Structure formats: structure tokens, C-alpha cells
Amino acid sequence: MKLKKILITGSNGLLGQKLIDLYLNNKDIEFIATAKGKNRHPTQQGYVYTSLDITNPDEINKIIRYHKPDCIIHTAAMTNVDQCEEDREGAKLLNIDAVEYLVSVANSIHAHFIHLSTDFIFDGTSGPYTETDTPSPLSFYGETKLTAENIIRTQCKKWSIIRTVLVYGIVHDMSRSNIVLWAKGALEKRQPLNIVHDQYRSPTLAEDLAIGCQLVEQKNAEGIFNISGKDQMSIVELVERVADFFDLDKSIINKVSSNTLNQVAKRPPITGFNLEKSREILGYEPRSFEEGIQLIMQQSITK
């Protein structure tokens, strides 16, 4: 029996590493992980790793045509919102041009193209959002991700778009922090913390997002799907819930307005997603925020 081939981009990122974990022991899948540079996942066996620069169309063409995957899960992107605002050329290259290159080669080999998108395509005036709500990005990052969505919807033969919100989790080498570990570390220092009270999100556990990607792949589900956490909260509530979980002092938390932060890019005030479609079609069911904290703390202890 011919094994189904799945290729992912951005395998050194948080979601990419969780996808490797998820597919690692699946004997029915031939799994190809790609990222720029060396493989940073601790397990090097059981799948193929290939270095891939997604801004190089010749490299994309050569590597993807060689492997001929049945499904491409595209996780690589420039996701730092302020960086995208300051380096618009770099953001366009990674978030728009690379998608055009990938869509072109995906079409040529008849691959199912699964693309990761964001709540930042919305202006945040009427969240939580459904898959059919009208986007209106406030930042250049949001603009690039919406442009990529439109390219996929108009040019790709077989596509899925997975929109997500504020992903948290830990990579295997602990090289990157996340909002939960940052909040815990900041609270433990017992110094005053200024946290915004007027931005609302549905934080998404990286493992849940990986499962959402797998469900879309397994069910060959086409179209747009919201895959996020189920608990909507303000950023200050998020930090307070971390404090409650670890029994840390909440009195050091100062609630501030987001316009006092002088951030380069505008953020949507209220996002979060309605998950009805993903629950009904995919059977997606995310963990609670506290269950997510519990999991990443167990992982950080064993690292």
C-alpha cells in the first residue's frame, strides 16, 4: 500500500515541532519536515528532514517536486507583528510571495495545501469571529496574511485555511518563551507588571493546533476553519489565571490601556473565534486554558 506523504514547512517552529511529535509514530504516513537550516527537533529518525528556504522558488520547486507530497501543511511565516510593520519587504517575501510559490507547485502535483492564518486579519471590533465574517486588518502583518488567504482561495485547486489565535507552548530545546512561561516568570520576580486590559484573545495550545491541522488533513476537509482555544479572555485575565494556577501574587498586576504601550503595529482589541464549524465538521475539541498550562508545565519539568 502506498503511504500518504505529508510535507510541512516551518518544522523548527513551535507548531512545526508539535506536528513532528504528532506524526512521528504514524506508520501510515511518510512525513517530510522542512525548515531553513538544521533540524532542531530532538528526534531525528522516523521521518525525512530537508532544509528549505521558502523564499527561493527554485528550491521550493526542486524539493517539493522531488518528494511529491499528497498534502502540504504550510506553517512557516513572519509572525512578529511589529517586525512585519518595520520590515515590510521581508514580511511580503515570507507571508505573500512564498505562498504564491508554494501554491503554484502544490497545484502542479495536485497536493492538498493547508495554510495557517491568523485572527489579525480582523479589526477586533466584533469578535469572536466565524469563518464567514469579513476581514479588515489593522496591521501590515494582518494585511499580508489576508493577501495570502486571497491568493490561496483564488489560485489553489485544493486548499484549506486554518485560522488561529495567540499560540502558546514550548519547543523541545526551550529556546523560545511563550506568554504562559513569560507570565509565570514575571510574576515570580514579584515586581509590578503592566498588563493590557483591553485586548481579548482565545489562547491556543500548540498541541491543539497541531491536532486541528491533522484533522483537516485526515478528513480532506477543504475551506476555512477556526482552530483556537475555547476560553476567551483579556490579556490581564490570562496573566491572572496563570497567577491563580501557580498560587502567585496578583496584587503586582497593574491594568493598563493598550494605547500606553507605544507598540509599532496596531492590534485588534477583541478577537477569538467561534468554533462551531470545526467542532461539527472536524470533531475538534480544544483543552481549557488551565489544562494547557498543566501540560506545558509538565513538559518544562521533563526537559
Positions of the model-derived regions?
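Glycine-rich Rossmann NAD(P)(H)-binding loop
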Residues: 195-200, 225-232, 281
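Conserved C-terminal active-site "lid" loop/helix of NAD(P)H-dependent oxidoreductases
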Residues: 234-240, 257-296, 301-303
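Conserved Rossmann-fold NAD(P)-dependent oxidoreductase catalytic core, especially the SDR/UDP-sugar
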Residues: 100-136
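NAD(P)-dependent short-chain dehydrogenase/reductase
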Residues: 150-201, 208
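Mid/C-terminal beta-alpha module of Rossmann-like enzyme folds, strongest
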Residues: 212, 219-264
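NAD(P)H-binding glycine-rich loop region in Rossmannoid oxidoreductase-like domains
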Residues: 51-94
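N-terminal Rossmann NAD(P)H-binding glycine-rich loop of SDR-like oxidoreductase domains
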Residues: 3-26
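NAD(P)-cofactor binding segment of oxidoreductase domains
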Residues: 86-114, 146, 151
